[in-house]
Amino acid sequence: MASFTTTSSSSLLLKTLLPVSHLNRFSTLSGIRVGDSWTPLLRNISTAGSRRRVAIVKAATVDSDYSSKRSNSNEQRETIMLPGCDYNHWLIVMEFPKDPAPSRDQMIDTYLNTLATVLGSMEEAKKNMYAFSTTTYTGFQCTIDEETSEKFKGLPGVLWVLPDSYIDVKNKDYGGDKYINGEIIPCTYPTYQPKQRNNTKYQSKRYERKRDGPPPPEQRKPRQEPAASDSS
């Protein structure tokens, strides 16, 4: 398990933000703010595990006013332990054009080609990519060392290079759709299902909607005259 020291330096901020999984545990990191001053990169989504990953992938730098105040102070830095961070599992966040937006297959091909550029072959890329996403976030996860991770910087479409960490600590799961030697296994995070309303007690109160307009005229039966008696 790795330890990470927060800092106001924008070059170290991306590595300090890290994996995208523990914002629910740390609402604020020393020197890092999550609030209106951030420019959101990704949208929130419904699954709990992915929400944690998306939440911390927020922005590249803090606002300059806050950073300058931080750099001029002697505030002590905080060290945060993140389960799963070992500098051998990395999250590569990428961006894609919106118009026209690429298909899922095209995004996966881009992930593999980007990793192949770093590792030297498509075969190695397929061996080392272990997960990815094209929906809740746009990026892939791969097993490489820290020195190799530096080679992603400056490649087309690459936004951030972040050490990965568990989104499910109990099951040691890094999240995303699994990618095992070319085989894709979609993630199966539980989603919230609202309880269905019990309408049994309302069934007796159902009624039919009346037609618009005035009520139809009342129809009366003709009055029957009493039968005349025969005269004797």
From Swiss-Prot:
Gene Ontology annotations for the cellular component aspect, listed alphabetically: chloroplast; chloroplast envelope; chloroplast stroma
Region (Disordered): 190-232
Transit peptide: 1-58
GO biological process: chloroplast RNA modification; cytidine to uridine editing; mRNA processing
Residue ranges, compositional bias (Basic and acidic residues): 205-224
Cited Gene3D superfamilies: Peptidase S8 propeptide/proteinase inhibitor I9
Pfam family membership, one: MORF_dom
Phenotype seen when the gene is deleted: White leaves with green islands, giving a variegated appearance. Mutant plants can grow autotrophically on soil.
Record field: compositional bias (Polar residues): 190-202
One GO MF term: mRNA binding
Keywords, alphabetical: Chloroplast, mRNA processing, Plastid, Transit peptide
Domain of life: Eukaryota
InterPro entries: MORF/ORRM1/DAG-like, MORF/ORRM1/DAG-like_MORF, S8pro/Inhibitor_I9_sf
Location within or outside the cell: Plastid, Chloroplast
Family: Belongs to the MORF family.
Quaternary structure, from the entry: Homodimer and heterodimer with MORF2. Interacts with protoporphyrinogen oxidase 1 PPOX1. Heterodimer with MORF5/RIP5. Interacts with PCMP-A2/PMD1. Interacts with ORRM6.
Protein's job: Involved in organellar RNA editing. Required for the processing of multiple editing sites in plastids.
This protein's name: Multiple organellar RNA editing factor 9, chloroplastic
Gene: MORF9
